[in-house]
Amino acid sequence: MRLRTEVRDLWATADSQEVRVGDARILVRELSADSLDFVVTSPPYWNILHKEDHKAKQERVSHDLDTRYSDHKHDLGNIPKYETFLYELASILGACGKALKPKKYMAVIVSDFRDKSRFVLFHADLAHALEPYGFEMRGLSVLYQRHKRIFPYGYPYAYVPNIHHQFILILQNVKK
């Protein structure tokens, strides 16, 4: 469904995809060393679906979609502290570096978000967190989400802009 919404013009050319279900910490270890030419992923955004006042949660409820993927303590969406979440996510994506061939690329699709009044620069935090794993930023693209509606957050007391885009981090595996 998401592919049809985000890249509907390209949907006709998508042949097949392999989907593996499980804990990414375990699944990534099953990949053979230097076996991948490209990695693309869109990881969870911390625990934003748990927040009562979050628009994404309200939207998911209105469409009868899950707002909690699991109650498992290892679920990234259940980690209460952002710093711990970022560390865990970086370690999972960093482990992809073993399977990704040298000098090949990983694209990570993320969105910045708000945690109450704090604006979290998730894309920048994640890019920095991946540097110790041998991933260097090579580019940043913006994915405009033209299907999202505009909401007057904070009006008339504050300016709170909507987030109508995601970032695509283009990272290169610089291991030799």
Predicted stretch roles:
Residues 1-176:
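Class I S-adenosyl-L-methionine-dependent methyltransferase catalytic core
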